[in-house]
């Protein structure tokens, strides 16, 4: 019985007797603020028989590739200030890019620590274990930013973060395996994560920005229940954080 719920809802919401097949892009519009911002698109195919995620197989078209780039997996990154659209079938996302020439300083709490968590550095099996690894300890999943700031900036005579020569920081040398790292390679020198960590170090490895906003909530899309059927049994998610200054 479950398999007929989505088609029935679609029929009730349309004036025509059958659902119109096509692509839906989410979100309908978005603002990218600064060169480090990014957006994960969600591409959904709907017809009278199924709802399927096509985020990683869809062929996106960017009206102005000079303003944004979009990967095959639906990841959008800014290139220059302006307004453009990304299209898929009849669906369209309006993208506005601002702040490329004057990026905000890297936030230790909202950018540096999340990158380290995503790389697995603060996981319980790595430096987030109770005693750390290799004389380097981070709080588990960055629950204690003050402790993490101390170990990253103050310990090891400042060798973990070197603002004068950022590339020689152990925080970059270890995960790229430029020097021996028991945990193996975690970071690519050409990746956005490497660029962010390098920028944070080059800016002086600041631990707090003045009047820094706080996260007030998150939104996960798709938010509605979905029944996925083989072979279309995968689903891409996007998570948007909302901050106290009104940005997301």
Give the role of each language-model region.
Residues 1-2:
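N-terminal secretory signal peptides that target proteins for export/translocation
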Residues 5-16:
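Bacterial N-terminal signal peptides
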Residues 20-248:
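Aromatic- and Gly/Pro-enriched helix-to-coil junctions and flexible linker segments
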